[in-house]
């Protein structure tokens, strides 16, 4: 039985990947940070949204903001793996994209996600 469970586990993980829009993610953190952390922080999920900006942090890591925040200054942020910098370079504001990310909690109610990769 244990062998059967472990064999089916990878397939279940792919099927159970939580899907959310950037707006739903932002609203979840705006409503209740503790509940949103329990749902997203440290977990992989698929997020879809419209690119608002493409940036680099102070360490040169590329990150994207997607529209959907509770206001224009609180758009959710998605840090890409450095190996996907070329992907970030192809993006333009207004493009609709999907990413697979790990939730990183929030900073002042702004949802932060990390280790993001483009959804194939």
Regions found by a protein language model. Name each.
Residues 1-120:
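OB-fold and OB-like single-stranded nucleic-acid-recognition modules
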């Amino acid at each position: 039985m244990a062998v059967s469970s472990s064999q089916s586990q990878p397939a279940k993980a792919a099927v159970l990947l939580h899907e959310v829009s950037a707006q739903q993610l932002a609203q979840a953190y705006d409503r209740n940070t503790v509940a949103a952390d329990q749902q997203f922080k440290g977990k992989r999920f698929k997020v879809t949204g419209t690119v608002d900006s493409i940036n680099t942090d102070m360490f040169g890591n590329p990150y994207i903001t997607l529209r959907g925040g509770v206001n224009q200054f609180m758009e959710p942020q998605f840090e890409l793996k450095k190996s996907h910098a070329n992907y970030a370079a192809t993006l333009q504001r207004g493009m609709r994209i999907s990413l697979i990310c790990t939730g990183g909690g929030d900073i002042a109610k702004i949802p932060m996600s990390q280790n993001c990769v483009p959804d194939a």
